[in-house]
Regions:
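Short, well-ordered alpha-helical segments enriched in acidic and aromatic residues
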Residues: 32, 45-74
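Sec/Tat-exported extracytoplasmic proteins
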Residues: 37-44, 62-66, 90-97
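A mature extracytoplasmic/lumenal domain signature
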Residues: 72-74, 108, 120-124, 157-160
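Surface-exposed, charged secondary-structure patches
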Residues: 85-130
């Protein structure tokens, strides 16, 4: 009986270790979403070195083999862009803002044929250097593709909830 309990305990520890060290693809994709949100967020006391590191992290999360598609209402840069172009636009946009706070409110991941689709809702609070403040909650869809064993963002678009 004692040997059975020890065997069950060893199996339980092995399962927990497996789950911790080998997360599911969905968890890895959600982690990429967390990383891109963190690379865009900007606290008021952020220094130049932190900003540069975040810009590099942002660019590393994007597909650098193809253009990234952006289709977001009221976004001035809709269309297809290279990863370096988007990283440059992200850096410029962050310069105009005192703070950027993006919070993930919920996300659902679907993976099919090496393409991941994340339906998520994000809450934004942005304060510009000119004193304007924007608070908004919007649903989005992000698409990622597995490239060289890493999930890279290939598209961002608004999720149409209601059509006019």
């Amino acid at each position: 009986m004692k040997q059975i309990i020890i065997a069950i305990a060893i199996i339980a520890v092995a399962i927990v270790a497996w789950l911790l060290f080998f997360p599911s693809e969905k968890k890895i994709v959600l982690k990429q979403l967390d990383k891109i949100i963190e690379s865009v967020n900007k606290p008021s006391d952020e220094g130049n070195i932190a900003a540069a590191a975040k810009n590099l992290a942002f660019g590393a999360l994007l597909d650098d083999t193809n253009e990234i598609s952006i289709i977001i209402d009221e976004f001035p840069y809709n269309g297809s862009h290279s990863s370096s172009e988007l990283a440059s636009l992200e850096a410029q946009g962050r310069l105009y803002c005192e703070t950027i706070d993006i919070r993930l409110k919920g996300a659902d991941v679907e993976i099919k044929d090496g393409v991941a689709t994340i339906n998520f809702t994000a809450a934004f609070t942005v304060v510009t250097k000119f004193g304007s403040k924007y608070d908004e909650i919007r649903p989005f869809v992000a698409t990622l593709k597995k490239i060289d064993k890493k999930w890279k963002f290939t598209a961002f678009r608004d999720k149409q909830v209601l059509k006019k």
